Amino acid sequence: MNTATRVIVAQNVRTRNRTFQITKQGVVIVALVIALLCSAFGVVYFKDLNRRLFIQYQTLQREKAEELIQWGKLLLEQTTWSTQSRVQRIAEQQLGMQLPSAKEVILVNADAMIE
């Protein structure tokens, strides 16, 4: 082998057996890469969490609207069941009550009751 070939082969042998030294700069780079990956996974996780929570929020808003509609219907039904004519009809039919005549009505003076 000639001298030039020996030098090239010797350099290749040295680079193959090269040991890596842990330097402060290498540690910083590895730490930054790990921080970058954690940050990326965090962004993905929280975006997904935000999306799922927003869908849940919309579902709850829809349920609230449906419950308000149902509540309005129940209020209307309650008003219907408690109308004066219905109460009077049930009092007459089921309880045998009747409206008093004008002679049967007694007015009580509230001022006289206090004294």
Swiss-Prot record:
The chain crosses the membrane at residues 26-46. Its main location: membrane. GO terms for biological process: FtsZ-dependent cytokinesis. It comes from the Bacteria. Residues 1-25 are cytoplasmic. Disulfide bonds: none annotated. It is a single-pass type II membrane protein. Keywords: Cell cycle, Cell division, Cell inner membrane, Cell membrane, Membrane, Transmembrane, Transmembrane helix. Residues 47-115 are periplasmic. It holds the Pfam family FtsL. The keyword Oxidoreductase does not apply. GO terms for cellular component: cell division site; plasma membrane. It is found in: Cell inner membrane. Essential cell division protein. May link together the upstream cell division proteins, which are predominantly cytoplasmic, with the downstream cell division proteins, which are predominantly periplasmic. Part of a complex composed of FtsB, FtsL and FtsQ. Belongs to the FtsL family. This is Cell division protein FtsL. It comes from Coxiella burnetii (strain RSA 493 / Nine Mile phase I).
